[in-house]
């Protein structure tokens, strides 16, 4: 039932007609209105500018991974990045007909140390830079000892030095001397965290330049072991992203630390396989990103190293050239034994399904795992005129005279890289399962078109080594290379 309401008419007062305003009041009113509009515009611009500034500060501090959708890409990097391949060529190893020559690792390291102004972060496996560390009296240790001396001089001149190192079982003298000089050192117990080691090898200088490659902090890595790496100069975008990987190690080096189930957002990255960084590299457009292993050490946005490696293999259409010390489709350190065919399957598929030319240059020395030979023979057996599969395998043997042969754990090709017609992959891991699932490692991936870039330089290094007298087919007589190789 609708209630009965009493309505009363609302009386609106009748306004008296307004008279015309004088001209001076009209002009004053217009001026005030114009001023108010300008004030409003300035306020709007101030609010927008403040919002943009706060957003930029937020991204700088916390990363902007979650602000980008799946089809959106981060802004390109405008740094004039310069990449230089660097190598350690063991004493006595010569390439007389080579047309390519790269700076030495020791030259690159000393140059980075001389140019450091504010900070140096080093991720490392172990430290043996002096003869005392290896109980030797080798003149060739001088380069490593000079590197250590220059490192000791950094903190006293105001450079902040941080070193993340795998919890050591070996010599500590170098690290103790660096601590005394003012460096900070944290030991990462990867055995406790993932049942592996910290196998990474990189430097970041002033968050602007960096080295990444196969060389350990070992005098032998400068003069008695064949190494390859890359130095990036004036590339702060990539250097800051590599620093995020270092910060993860630094975090895990704290007492009682554990791997977070979800990494805090400051460790996240926006650069990965799906959204690589757009850079100008040696004057040429390129796409680049950094990958990391094992997966638990990959915060938001970081591509795992194995996924990155397999993407290079899967996207190759012409050739895949690989140079690594160890190649095993197994969990190398697993008990009981476990087969691990992830990379092996990718290479076979590339050769058989797409007709990609595959070349593997594997190291052979006195410490090679004998079971590698069977797996390498299996790969090489795919080369067949009927299937048109083209896989070839060679063993690289670094020769040694009597004195060199006495140097422990030396005279080996320690490279860890891959190059295709499109992409450069430079890593720090050997190619067996445990290195990608348990051990900490890092890789740099660069895609670049044209000739003369980093990719073509690395291809030239591979072909130089492949065609050299130090590379041997699997059916080579063991007598022809002496007893330095366990796989012949």
UniProtKB/Swiss-Prot annotation:
<keyword id="KW-0460">Magnesium</keyword>
<dbReference type="Pfam" id="PF13918">
    <property type="entry name" value="PLDc_3"/>
</dbReference>
<keyword id="KW-0832">Ubl conjugation</keyword>
<keyword id="KW-0479">Metal-binding</keyword>
<keyword id="KW-0395">Inflammatory response</keyword>
<keyword id="KW-0269">Exonuclease</keyword>
<feature type="topological domain" description="Lumenal">
    <location>
        <begin position="60"/>
        <end position="488"/>
    </location>
</feature>
<dbReference type="GO" id="GO:0005765">
    <property type="term" value="C:lysosomal membrane"/>
</dbReference>
<comment type="subunit">
    <text>Homodimer. Interacts with APP.</text>
</comment>
<feature type="site" description="Cleavage; by lysosomal cysteine proteases">
    <location>
        <begin position="71"/>
        <end position="72"/>
    </location>
</feature>
<dbReference type="GO" id="GO:0046872">
    <property type="term" value="F:metal ion binding"/>
</dbReference>
<feature type="binding site">
    <location>
        <position position="414"/>
    </location>
    <ligand>
        <name>phosphate</name>
    </ligand>
</feature>
<feature type="disulfide bond">
    <location>
        <begin position="364"/>
        <end position="485"/>
    </location>
</feature>
<feature type="active site">
    <location>
        <position position="201"/>
    </location>
</feature>
<feature type="topological domain" description="Cytoplasmic">
    <location>
        <begin position="1"/>
        <end position="38"/>
    </location>
</feature>
<keyword id="KW-1015">Disulfide bond</keyword>
<dbReference type="GO" id="GO:0002376">
    <property type="term" value="P:immune system process"/>
</dbReference>
<dbReference type="InterPro" id="IPR001736">
    <property type="entry name" value="PLipase_D/transphosphatidylase"/>
</dbReference>
<keyword id="KW-0812">Transmembrane</keyword>
<keyword id="KW-0256">Endoplasmic reticulum</keyword>
<feature type="active site" description="Proton donor">
    <location>
        <position position="199"/>
    </location>
</feature>
<feature type="binding site">
    <location>
        <position position="201"/>
    </location>
    <ligand>
        <name>phosphate</name>
    </ligand>
</feature>
<dbReference type="GO" id="GO:0005789">
    <property type="term" value="C:endoplasmic reticulum membrane"/>
</dbReference>
<feature type="transmembrane region" description="Helical; Signal-anchor for type II membrane protein">
    <location>
        <begin position="39"/>
        <end position="59"/>
    </location>
</feature>
<keyword id="KW-0391">Immunity</keyword>
<keyword id="KW-0735">Signal-anchor</keyword>
<keyword id="KW-1133">Transmembrane helix</keyword>
<dbReference type="GO" id="GO:0000139">
    <property type="term" value="C:Golgi membrane"/>
</dbReference>
<feature type="disulfide bond">
    <location>
        <begin position="77"/>
        <end position="237"/>
    </location>
</feature>
<keyword id="KW-0677">Repeat</keyword>
<dbReference type="GO" id="GO:0014902">
    <property type="term" value="P:myotube differentiation"/>
</dbReference>
<keyword id="KW-1208">Phospholipid metabolism</keyword>
<feature type="domain" description="PLD phosphodiesterase 2">
    <location>
        <begin position="409"/>
        <end position="435"/>
    </location>
</feature>
<feature type="glycosylation site" description="N-linked (GlcNAc...) asparagine">
    <location>
        <position position="385"/>
    </location>
</feature>
<dbReference type="GO" id="GO:0006954">
    <property type="term" value="P:inflammatory response"/>
</dbReference>
<protein>
    <recommendedName>
        <fullName>5'-3' exonuclease PLD3</fullName>
        <ecNumber>3.1.16.1</ecNumber>
        <ecNumber>3.1.4.-</ecNumber>
    </recommendedName>
</protein>
<feature type="binding site">
    <location>
        <position position="436"/>
    </location>
    <ligand>
        <name>Mg(2+)</name>
    </ligand>
</feature>
<keyword id="KW-0333">Golgi apparatus</keyword>
<dbReference type="GO" id="GO:0031902">
    <property type="term" value="C:late endosome membrane"/>
</dbReference>
<dbReference type="GO" id="GO:0031901">
    <property type="term" value="C:early endosome membrane"/>
</dbReference>
<feature type="glycosylation site" description="N-linked (GlcNAc...) asparagine">
    <location>
        <position position="234"/>
    </location>
</feature>
<feature type="glycosylation site" description="N-linked (GlcNAc...) asparagine">
    <location>
        <position position="97"/>
    </location>
</feature>
């Amino acid at each position: 039932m609708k209630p009965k309401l009493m309505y009363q008419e609302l009386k609106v007062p009748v306004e008296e007609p307004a008279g015309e305003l004088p001209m001076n009041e009209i002009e004053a009113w217009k001026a005030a209105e114009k001023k108010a509009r300008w004030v409003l515009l300035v306020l709007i611009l101030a609010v927008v500018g403040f919002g943009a500034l706060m957003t930029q500060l937020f991204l700088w501090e916390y990363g902007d991974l979650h602000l980008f959708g799946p089809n959106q890409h981060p802004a390109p990097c405008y740094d004039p990045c310069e990449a230089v391949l660097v190598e350690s060529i063991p004493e006595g190893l010569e390439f007389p007909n080579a047309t390519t020559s790269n700076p030495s690792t020791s030259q690159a390291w000393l140059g980075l140390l001389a140019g450091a102004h504010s900070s140096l972060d080093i991720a490392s496996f172990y430290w043996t830079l002096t003869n005392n560390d290896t109980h030797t009296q080798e003149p060739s240790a001088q380069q490593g000892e000079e590197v250590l001396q220059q490192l000791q001089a950094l903190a006293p001149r105001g450079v902040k030095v941080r070193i993340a190192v795998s919890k050591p079982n070996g010599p500590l003298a170098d690290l103790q001397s660096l601590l005394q000089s003012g460096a900070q050192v944290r030991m990462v117990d990867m055995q406790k965290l993932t049942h592996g080691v910290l196998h990474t090898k990189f430097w970041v200088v002033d968050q602007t330049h960096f080295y990444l490659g196969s060389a350990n902090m070992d005098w032998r890595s400068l003069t008695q072991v064949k190494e390859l790496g890359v130095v990036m100069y004036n590339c702060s975008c990539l250097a800051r992203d590599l620093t995020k990987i270092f910060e993860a190690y630094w975090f895990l080096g704290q007492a009682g630390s554990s791997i977070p189930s979800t990494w805090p957002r400051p460790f996240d990255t926006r650069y990965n396989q799906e959204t690589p960084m757009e850079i100008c590299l040696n004057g040429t457009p390129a796409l680049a990103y950094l990958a990391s292993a094992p997966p638990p050490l990959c915060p938001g946005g970081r591509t795992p190293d194995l996924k990155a490696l397999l993407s290079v293999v899967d996207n190759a259409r012409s050739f895949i050239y690989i140079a690594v010390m160890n190649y095993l489709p197994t969990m190398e350190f697993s008990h009981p034994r476990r087969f691990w065919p992830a990379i092996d399957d990718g290479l076979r598929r590339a050769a058989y399904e797409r007709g990609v030319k595959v070349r593997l240059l594997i190291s052979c020395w006195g410490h090679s795992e004998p079971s590698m030979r069977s797996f390498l023979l299996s790969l090489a057996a795919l080369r067949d005129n009927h299937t048109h599969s083209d896989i070839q395998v060679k063993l690289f043997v670094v020769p040694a005279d009597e004195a060199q042969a006495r140097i422990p754990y030396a005279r080996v090709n320690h490279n860890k890289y891959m190059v295709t017609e499109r992409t450069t992959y430079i890593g720090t891991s050997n190619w067996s399962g445990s290195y990608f699932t348990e051990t900490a490692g890092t890789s740099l991936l660069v895609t670049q078109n044209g000739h003369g870039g980093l990719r073509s330089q690395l291809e030239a290094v591979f072909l130089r080594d492949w065609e050299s007298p130090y590379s041997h087919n699997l059916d080579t007589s063991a007598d022809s290379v002496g007893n330095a190789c366990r796989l012949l």
